[in-house]
Amino acid sequence: MKVIIAATLLGILMHAFAEECELMPPGDNFDLEKYFSIPHVYVTHSRNGPKEQVCREYKTTKNSDGTTTTLVTSDYKTGGKPYHSELKCTNTPKSGVKGQFSVECEVPNGNGGKKKIHVETSVIATDYKNYALLQSCTKTESGIADDVLLLQTKKEGVDPGVTSVLKSVNWSLDDWFSRSKVNCDNMK
């Protein structure tokens, strides 16, 4: 009987830990000041989707308390009908891990109010000027939503630094959702 109880508890614990975000390690020698000096970027590629991810822009400002605020805007059309959303997110550096953040976002709930969601992020790589690879992990009611986003200061093309980083981890942008392949003005 003790073995059955122990096995059951172990199974419950394993399931609980399996439902947590597992962030990839951030890039070496991450510099917070340099990273947040990139004020405006476009999501040009998304590893897991959904395709609407690549119709987003991030605008970041520094706050006096050491946090940063990112305004995430999303604009696209589906069947001619326009969609616009704005998320206001506060990025707080995780204690002891440079390049990882706990992020609180305010999401409009459709009733004129706002709902808060919690996102964990890790800056996998950046050149502090033109691009960043950002892992984003959100725990939802239906499970874990994990993605890697390519953020770039230009909407089109791929910075050469990105290509070498992706090769080092055996990833290819050919398999990712791309802003150039998704028509944000008429998504189907």
UniProtKB/Swiss-Prot annotation:
One of its GO terms (molecular function) is toxin activity. Residues 1-18 form the signal peptide. One of its GO terms (cellular component) is extracellular region. Disulfide bonds join C21-C137, C55-C184, C89-C105. Pfam families: Triabin (PF03973). Gene3D superfamilies: 2.40.128.20. It is found in: Secreted. Keywords: Disulfide bond, Hemostasis impairing toxin, Platelet aggregation inhibiting toxin, Secreted, Signal, Toxin. Expressed in salivary glands. GO terms for biological process: symbiont-mediated perturbation of host defenses. Belongs to the calycin superfamily. Triabin family. Has been described as a specific inhibitor of collagen-induced platelet aggregation. However, as it does not affect platelet shape change or adhesion, it is plausible that it exerts its antiplatelet activity by a mechanism similar to that of triplatin, moubatin and dipetalodipin as scavenging eicosanoids involved in inflammation such as thromboxane A2 (TXA2). This is Pallidipin. It comes from Meccus pallidipennis.
